[in-house]
């Protein structure tokens, strides 16, 4: 997804300048060509990713990831974790056009991943602040260089 080979085909956008759809609160690029959208919860708009994929104002973006929080666009660690642990490839990938070519699915951009929390997912587990402080304080003891 983030690799290209061969001759350059297009300029990848680095900024979103359009008007947002209803139920989309924010848009920020994660990297050139990959836009993160903060959208309404899955419970309140289950078809939002499908709407984004079909909307022409997002046509210049090759990859769009729909999240619950825009902050995931601001950190590679958060983006990768929140994206790849919160979508099911069989049900959460949408595109402007989908074709079957030689028994392979072919997506035409934008390709939208719905990485919002779903009602059937377990709740996020957050560490207790005291535990975080203890581990941070003793990290070198646990894992000396």
Q: Which residues are covered by each model-predicted region?
A:
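Charged, compositionally biased interaction regions
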Residues: 1-145
């Amino acid at each position: 997804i983030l690799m290209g080979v061969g001759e350059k085909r297009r300029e990848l956008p680095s900024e979103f300048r359009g008007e947002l759809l209803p139920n989309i609160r924010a848009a920020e690029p994660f990297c050139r060509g990959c836009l993160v959208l903060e959208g309404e919860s899955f419970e309140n708009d289950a078809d939002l990713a499908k709407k984004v994929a079909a909307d022409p104002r997002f046509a210049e973006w090759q990859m769009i990831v729909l999240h619950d929080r825009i902050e995931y666009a601001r950190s590679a660690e958060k983006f990768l974790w929140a994206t790849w642990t919160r979508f099911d490839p069989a049900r959460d990938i949408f595109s402007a056009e989908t074709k079957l070519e030689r028994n392979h699915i072919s997506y035409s951009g934008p390709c939208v991943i719905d990485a919002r929390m779903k009602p059937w997912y377990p709740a996020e587990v957050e560490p207790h602040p005291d535990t975080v402080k203890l581990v941070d304080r003793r990290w070198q003891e646990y894992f000396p260089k």
